[in-house]
Amino acid sequence: PIMLKSKWCHLHGLSREELVEKGEDPNEPGGYFIINGTEKVLITIEDLASNKFLVEKPSSGTSEYVGKMFSEYGSFKIPHTLEKLKDGIFYLTFTRVKRIPAILIIKALGLLKDEEITRFVSENRQFDEVIINLIEFASIKAEDEALDYVAKKIGITQSKEVRIERMREILDKYLLPHLGIKKEDRIFKAYNLCKMLKKFLRVSREELQVDDKDHYMNKKLKLAGDLLSDLLRLNIKVLIGDLLYNFQRMVKRGKFPTIKNLIRDKLLTQRIYSSMATGTWVSGRKGISQRIQRLNYLEMLSHLQRVVSPLSASQENFEARELHSTHLGRLCPIETPEGT
């Protein structure tokens, strides 16, 4: 299906007179799809921005402030959490790595000198909190020592060489993957962790304000293109799985199949059409694709610009449902993210 009036649509760039000649309404905005003869619009989804470090005050828990970030690489997001517990140590959590001292992770990434770490956290002054953390782990002076310490903490039990190699792999793949997943990207990750520490410290000392999750600077909107790329990515994985299954089945029977026999050509198209027709999307979300309401022209425009919040109706979060000053001029004034 092609979005009406998009680059590949034959109505793209036509003047009002040409549209009338083709039997089209010249005031029609486009931006929707026609699926099995029904006009369907893909509703924009509001989400927290990825790769952005936000510090907030949690309503409960052991630490006064918590820094959070979703590092996005390709199709997956990895949540990272930075917190300072009562012992004064900064702890970092991501995937399997739970509450590991942040200074150790920085050392494991190759930034070893205490002087350099303090300089990267803050050039023009010293934070006492950082010095406490550095003194705590002053005995660890080599990258391998730091890697081995972290590996033991998270329960990797093989020999020392294997432990260190496994730990390097985890740091490359799962720690801030948006900065890169190669060996040479490790030092950038260390610098970034220092910057995250600096922001965390400044917020905890009340030099900076706590980040507002509902500010539109900290949000991103998933438009039709993002939603369709998610759908395509998932269905290509299904297609590859189907292709492998067919290949193995035919080889077991002693046949050597051609590519044409292996690929079910309708599979990808049918799955994408089905999602767009029913509105059921990746990860089981419903109501993404909706039939356009054409009660009047304004309602149709409003429906095309509607934004849906990711919160379910049962979640109580009053701030997220209120109008924020940053919505002005960005969201349709008739439609708030709640759809009222």
Language model regions located:
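N-terminal non-catalytic structural scaffold regions of very large proteins
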Residues: P1-H303, V307-P310, H324, P337
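Conserved helicase core region in the C-terminal RecA-like lobe
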Residues: L331-E338
